[in-house]
Amino acid sequence: MTRPVHACPLVSRKAPPLSGKVHVPGDKSISHRALMLSALAVGESFVEGLLEGEDVLATAEAMRSMGADIRKDEKGCWHIHGVGVGSLLQPQNALDMGNSGTSTRLLMGVVASHPITATFIGDASLSKRPMGRISTPLSLMGARFSAAEGNRLPMTVTGLYPAIPIEYRLPVASAQVKSAILLAGLNTPGITRVIEPVPTRDHSERMLKGYGANLSVEENDGVRIISIHGEAELKPQHIIVPGDPSSAAFLVVAGLIVPGSDLIVENVGLNPTRSGLYTMLKAMGGQIEYLNPREVGGEPVADLSVKYSHLKAIDVPPSIVPSMIDEFPILFIAAAMAEGKSTLQGLAELRVKESDRIAVMAEGLKALGVSLEEKEDGLIIEGSAGEGLGQKGKMVSIAAHLDHRIAMSFAVAGLVSEGGVTIDDRRPIMTSFPVFGQLFKELGAEFEMGLVK
């Protein structure tokens, strides 16, 4: 889908020490799944702390289009009246997913085992992302796909009921593919199995169980086997969404690299399949302390105390990559400020995200004077040992390529730049972290927001 482009630049300049407390908004992954599973339950579910970014709102609108009644009350709690597994309605119009790959891929799984047809469309960035890794297993279950060249959006999915239960071994670590198959398995007679050689985020498994799905997880020599027995009735739930660790990452890294900073990021989800970044930052010498550890909605949560730190270079082990795949852009910024040479490889997946995150980050870091080597599957970065990035008096321009994590990563880089950073378009930030600028302002760093042009 083509939309007119009206860029809204963001300017980030060297910041004073960051201090204060901020409360990170709800987790995007959990917010998506809460809406989908509540819409497939029988009865009324309640969701507190839902992330109200554009991606999650696209999921809400899609579930409305398929029959769910979804509204927000005056206190900010979301009420979802579900239609039940197997009872989704035929959407009358195309489902516009905006920039959300998660919405698109998981909802394709939902549609695949229902007797309905849905056309998925998205923005320019999403329309470039390959969907073959989703259509391949769902086709084995009987769904039919009609797509643009290269298995890209727009894509029409025609579900099959009864769908065919499958046993599928994931060729690459992907929580989205795993989740799509499990969601398709919800309305499929028999047992659908996913074999996961490398663990990925497990929100789908946790939440499916919580809603009453008949799901089991076995582990055998590091391999996870997830089995779902289809056609169970989902029960409505009251979900409290913990804070998003992927969003908190930008605040935490800023606190580590801006000299003199001392801050607290509250309400951060620390699911072990999502917290790899914090493990790596601590290994780099980052002063991060977990305060008030607790459980929220079945997920581990803590407040993070963060102090400016002299970071050391790191080599990221391949085993931890799936637990921090979305956080590598901001880890690249941390590595650029560290002492020594960091090796960050095994990241080929980054080339098919909202942008080619390896190439785009390499281009931007080079513009800031960072010495690096680009590999097919990652970057080798020579850090500045805490010296500011770029040159005094020289503003560096960065193209975000419609990618929220690129835009936010370089906004953080601007806080330790000598001449400032201009990001060409801040609008993608609204997809996942609409209060990004507001929270940084509360900590003492104010971004300049350019006018629409």
UniProtKB/Swiss-Prot annotation:
Annotated residues for binding of phosphoenolpyruvate: 28, 101, 129, 176, 357, 405
* UniProt GO BP: amino acid biosynthetic process; aromatic amino acid family biosynthetic process; chorismate biosynthetic process
Family annotation (InterPro entries): Enolpyruvate_Tfrase_dom, Enolpyruvate_Tfrase_sf, EPSP_synthase, EPSP_synthase_CS, RNA3'P_cycl/enolpyr_Trfase_a/b
- Is-annotated flag, keyword Amino-acid biosynthesis? yes
Query: Which amino acids does the record list as binding 3-phosphoshikimate?
Result: 28-29, 33, 174, 176, 326, 353
Location(s), subcellular:
Cytoplasm
* Chief place where the protein resides: cytoplasm
- Signal peptide range in chain numbering: none
Q: Which UniProt keywords apply?
A: Amino-acid biosynthesis, Aromatic amino acid biosynthesis, Cytoplasm, Transferase
- Look at the named UniProt entry and state the broad enzyme category this protein falls under: transferase
SUPFAM superfamilies listed in its UniProt record: EPT/RTPC-like
What Pfam families does the entry give? EPSP_synthase
Q: Which GO terms describe its molecular function?
A: 3-phosphoshikimate 1-carboxyvinyltransferase activity
Catalytic-site annotation from UniProt: 326
UniProt catalytic activity? 3-phosphoshikimate + phosphoenolpyruvate = 5-O-(1-carboxyvinyl)-3-phosphoshikimate + phosphate
Pathway it works in: Metabolic intermediate biosynthesis; chorismate biosynthesis; chorismate from D-erythrose 4-phosphate and phosphoenolpyruvate: step 6/7
Q: Which GO terms describe its cellular component?
A: cytoplasm
> What Enzyme Commission number(s) appear in the record?
2.5.1.19
The organism's superkingdom is given as Bacteria
The protein's matches in CDD domains, at most eight in alphabetical order, are given as: EPSP_synthase
Against HAMAP family, the record matches this protein to: EPSP_synth
Fill in the subunit field for this protein: Monomer.
What function is annotated for this protein? Catalyzes the transfer of the enolpyruvyl moiety of phosphoenolpyruvate (PEP) to the 5-hydroxyl of shikimate-3-phosphate (S3P) to produce enolpyruvyl shikimate-3-phosphate and inorganic phosphate.
Q: Which family does it belong to?
A: Belongs to the EPSP synthase family.
Name of the protein this chain belongs to: 3-phosphoshikimate 1-carboxyvinyltransferase
The organism is Zymomonas mobilis subsp. mobilis (strain ATCC 31821 / ZM4 / CP4)
